[in-house]
């Protein structure tokens, strides 16, 4: 299996779109997650991340420039008990609400499809981290159109039990830049998680995202034993 460094992987593309990273810290004591957004249009770049308790939402940086809040204003992060949900759209709420009714992550996402932003039909990417019995597991999902055909939805879920320390999985919306934008292909990528503080990891990710296209970054460390969290947010718009 190919294991990439965060720097090499992020530098491999100028435009990942939106990306989710989930893994276990090198010391095995923390669950680690990151979510970033990139943008090419004025509307997409006109955003910031705002923390609301344990949750996080997107917000227009300049309300006067907001053209269409559809698909770009949502909660990327919500916490339900011992579960942390991270997604690139309002499916965060779908997962939260249906898991709260005892449905599974995969069942909740059966009610959703890719985004309706023709011709890209941006994939919906999602992740959930669960702490239990002194350990952690997580799952990732991507919902995407079949070769750009909006009548067909392909659904992939990847589950990771007792993940290896010092490793993370990375999934993002686009395979490369283009018009239309080609959807992510294959399994989530495997990244090396260095033995660093949350501030150092945040800086590592932010520094290696494309300078022109990066918009915002969220990083969280979750203590597997206690559930205590450390969170960092970086916004290009200030």
Please give the residue ranges for each predicted region.
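Conserved short alpha-helical segments that host acidic/polar catalytic motifs at enzyme active sites
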Residues: 1-238
